[in-house]
């Protein structure tokens, strides 16, 4: 345990308290939407998914331990993280199917059901890619599994299949909806953009999964934000995709009970890649790329910090092989950690930032 972890923590920095506040915030937002937004029925799928996810995770964690699915911590990471070594990983394998199965039952309307099945398919595909990556890491006892090129190829293939189905069915609007009644017509460019967002978002959520409860809490908030803006757009909203968002939000809230500090389980690439894929698929089908960009600002910042760090280091690298570093360590949460901010303080701050971005995304949501 690091020095910063042993110092007195503010009440909101305690893992159980901050996680409880986050869960209450999401449920309050859902209940408010059901009361005041026409056609909104978000709380039931949220509650059901949270309860089932919590039960499945609670039963599955001992099994992960028995299978010796212990996380390998990279040596070059923050020294305080070495105590996390051996914590069960691949937790996404327990809870992602919960969200997918419950989400697929949200509606019986034929076209909406087909869309939800497509979202479920690409989410499960990314879960399997992440699971294979995690499994390779565990069997090799290293922090790296698949090669970056191999993982990128598999992610691209899964995204391409989803986009091909969406193109065939005519599900995706070629203009990106923006605030104030504006839109950005892209024509055929929407397809390479869609592929890029799949790769960028899934890897951004993956990079965010570096502190106890960080990705699961932020993910639950962003899914909730997407659901709320979907119900606020148009005359009757989009209950099917909004309901699917809430099952995913509930899934990650249930997981958060065990993933909060000190974590009893990690989601691994199994969960983080699936989270990013589900967010992207829903955003593409509902013309919500702009809300996803705003609400997922923490994911974006984490990803950009890595890109900037690598680019500057390579651009300034001298004959001795050393270059400049913009951040103490990337992703961004490690920069703050090495600056002396404890994990238990940092994670609630990132959750709060995400909640603020969700509110901003709702205020700047597209209409119609």
Swiss-Prot record:
GO terms for biological process: cell division; cell wall organization; peptidoglycan biosynthetic process; regulation of cell shape. Belongs to the glycosyltransferase 4 family. MraY subfamily. GO terms for molecular function: metal ion binding; phospho-N-acetylmuramoyl-pentapeptide-transferase activity; UDP-N-acetylmuramoyl-L-alanyl-D-glutamyl-meso-2,6-diaminopimelyl-D-alanyl-D-alanine:undecaprenyl-phosphate transferase activity. Its cofactor is Mg(2+). The gene is mraY. The lineage of its organism: Bacteria, Bacillati, Cyanobacteriota, Cyanophyceae, Synechococcales. Catalyzes the initial step of the lipid cycle reactions in the biosynthesis of the cell wall peptidoglycan: transfers peptidoglycan precursor phospho-MurNAc-pentapeptide from UDP-MurNAc-pentapeptide onto the lipid carrier undecaprenyl phosphate, yielding undecaprenyl-pyrophosphoryl-MurNAc-pentapeptide, known as lipid I. GO terms for cellular component: plasma membrane. This is Phospho-N-acetylmuramoyl-pentapeptide-transferase. Pfam families: Glycos_transf_4 (PF00953), MraY_sig1 (PF10555). The chain crosses the membrane at residues 11-31, 42-62, 86-106, 112-132, 152-172, 180-200, 211-231, 239-259, 265-285, 293-313, 347-367. Its main location: membrane. Coiled coil: none annotated. InterPro entries: Glycosyl_transferase_4, PNAcMuramoyl-5peptid_Trfase, PNAcMuramoyl-5peptid_Trfase_CS. Keywords: Cell cycle, Cell division, Cell inner membrane, Cell membrane, Cell shape, Cell wall biogenesis/degradation, Magnesium, Membrane, Metal-binding, Peptidoglycan synthesis, Transferase, Transmembrane, Transmembrane helix. It catalyses: UDP-N-acetyl-alpha-D-muramoyl-L-alanyl-gamma-D-glutamyl-meso-2,6-diaminopimeloyl-D-alanyl-D-alanine + di-trans,octa-cis-undecaprenyl phosphate = di-trans,octa-cis-undecaprenyl diphospho-N-acetyl-alpha-D-muramoyl-L-alanyl-D-glutamyl-meso-2,6-diaminopimeloyl-D-alanyl-D-alanine + UMP. It is an enzyme of class 2 (transferase). It is found in: Cell inner membrane. It is a multi-pass membrane protein.
């Amino acid at each position: 345990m690091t020095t910063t972890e042993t110092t007195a923590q503010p009440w909101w920095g305690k893992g159980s308290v901050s996680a409880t506040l986050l869960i209450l915030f999401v449920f309050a937002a859902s209940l408010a939407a059901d009361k005041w937004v026409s056609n909104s029925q978000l709380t039931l799928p949220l509650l059901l998914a949270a309860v089932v996810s919590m039960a499945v995770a609670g039963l599955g964690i001992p099994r992960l331990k028995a299978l010796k699915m212990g996380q390998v911590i990279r040596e070059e990471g923050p020294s305080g993280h070495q105590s996390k070594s051996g914590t069960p990983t691949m937790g996404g394998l327990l809870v992602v199917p919960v969200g997918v199965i419950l989400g697929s039952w949200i509606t019986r309307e034929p076209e909406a059901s087909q869309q939800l099945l497509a979202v479920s398919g690409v989410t499960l595909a990314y879960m399997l890619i992440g699971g294979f990556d995690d499994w390779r890491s565990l069997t090799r006892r290293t922090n790296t599994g698949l090669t970056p090129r191999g993982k990128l190829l598999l992610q691209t293939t899964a995204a391409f299949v989803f986009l091909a189905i969406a193109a065939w069915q005519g599900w995706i609007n070629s203009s990106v909806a923006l605030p104030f009644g504006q839109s950005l017509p892209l024509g055929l460019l929407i397809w390479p953009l869609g592929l890029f967002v799949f790769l960028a978002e899934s890897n951004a959520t993956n990079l965010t999964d570096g502190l106890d409860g960080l990705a699961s809490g932020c993910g639950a908030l962003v899914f909730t934000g997407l659901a709320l803006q979907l119900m606020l757009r148009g005359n009757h909203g989009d209950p099917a995709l909004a309901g699917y968002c809430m099952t995913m939000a509930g899934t990650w809230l249930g997981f958060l009970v065990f993933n909060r500090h000190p974590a009893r389980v990690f989601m691994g690439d199994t969960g983080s890649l699936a989270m990013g894929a589900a967010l992207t698929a829903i955003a593409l089908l509902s013309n919500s790329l702009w809300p996803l960009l705003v609400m997922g600002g923490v994911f974006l910042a984490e990803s950009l910090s890595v890109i900037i760090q690598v680019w500057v280091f390579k651009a300034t690298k001298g004959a001795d092989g050393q270059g400049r570093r913009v951040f103490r360590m990337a992703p961004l949460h490690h920069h703050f950690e090495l600056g002396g901010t404890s994990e238990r303080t940092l994670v609630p701050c990132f959750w709060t930032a995400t909640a603020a971005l969700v509110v901003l995304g709702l205020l700047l949501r597209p209409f119609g």
